[in-house]
Amino acid sequence: MTKTVWITGASSGIGREFARRYAAMGCRLILTARRADRLTALAEELNDAHGTVCRILPADLADRADCDRLCAELAGERIDIFINNAGFGVCGSLLETDPAKEEEMVQVNVAAMRRLFQFMLRRMQAQGGGTILNVASSAGLLP
């Protein structure tokens, strides 16, 4: 049976590499990130290289409505592996960083990650199993 893998933060860095690895393994992919153009380019790359079937679901995970929309769209879908990878960091002195950008970071790195984790945990319990990997790393941003 072909496994379905949902990857958030799939358009770059660690998420893109997860997509490439799972595509090489013959998995069906659901790719989520903010930039639809990058997701489309990645889906084309993976289809050309491996014949991978990719579903593209662009979303801004800082927006609760986008998180809710993703959950609604995927409610009936069997997802075997969930890579909860979306995230970013704001660097600099607390006195100098933009408070709105920091709030956006908390929404993506904490609130959305928790919301999607809970959604997938319930889905996987209902379907009889699955795998969730929560990724929290700044390694993809460092030289």
Region annotations inferred by a language model:
Residues S11-S12:
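Conserved glycine-rich cofactor-binding loop
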Residues S137:
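Residue(s) in the substrate-gating loop at a strand-loop-helix junction
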Residues N85-V90:
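Conserved NAD(P)H cofactor-binding loop of Rossmann-fold oxidoreductase domains
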Residues A36-D37, P58-R69, P99:
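The beta1-alpha1 cofactor-binding region of Rossmann-like NAD(H)/NADP(H)-dependent oxidoreductases
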Residues S93-L95, K101-V106:
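Substrate-binding pocket helix/loop in short-chain dehydrogenase/reductase
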Residues M25-A41:
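Conserved glycine-rich Rossmann-like NAD(P)H-binding loop of the short-chain dehydrogenase/reductase
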Residues F117-Q118:
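A short, exposed helix-loop element centered on a Lys and neighboring polar residues
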